[in-house]
Amino acid sequence: MNPTLLSPTTVTQRLYRLAFALSLFTIVYNVFEGLLAMYFGWADETLALFGFGVDSFIEVVSGLGIAHMVLRVQRHPTSSRDPFERTALRVTGYSFYVLTAGLVLSAAASAWTQHRPATTWVGVIVSLVSIVVMSALVVAKQRVGRQLESPSILADANCTRVCVYMSGVLLVASGLYELTGWPYFDALGTLGLAYFAFSEGREAIENAASDKLCGCCHP
């Protein structure tokens, strides 16, 4: 059928299905990314990569809430956040706080002992792939959000953009360590991830008690 002959309702439903598919892909990708990053982070003794992997699993919880949000908005465009989404935000927020504490303490211990990872090449590869994939997801979610005129989906795109920033932190820290061998780069990268984790955690907790659209809606 010619797309120009589709009714506005049919086009809208297709766009919502695409938005839901994008949210599911984000969840699945984060699971695989988390497993890979945590495994090699542990094996290569790189805190930044391991912390990045833990963050990916926390993003899965957030992603479940976002997927649920897309379905809710599809059925009731003007509805407010429901208990499931608020619970997902709270779990996400407190998990980020725990991660922040762990990253800061680990980074301090690493800097004190001048710990040297065996290698950070996997961190370079994982972060590069993540930047490409997450950037593509940001563009796709923004396009769908604009077509649907949905602030919720546009907010989700902003959440995904934060993942690009965190991948950039991992890339810089991992790349500089491989180039220089300076032991503090891994610790500094870990602290950079801790900053974003704390920011996301704080916003998730605050937004769980409000009707703001997303737990990480940075401009």
Language-model features, listed with the residues they occupy:
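Alpha-helical transmembrane cores and adjacent cytosolic helix/loop segments
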Residues: M1-P219
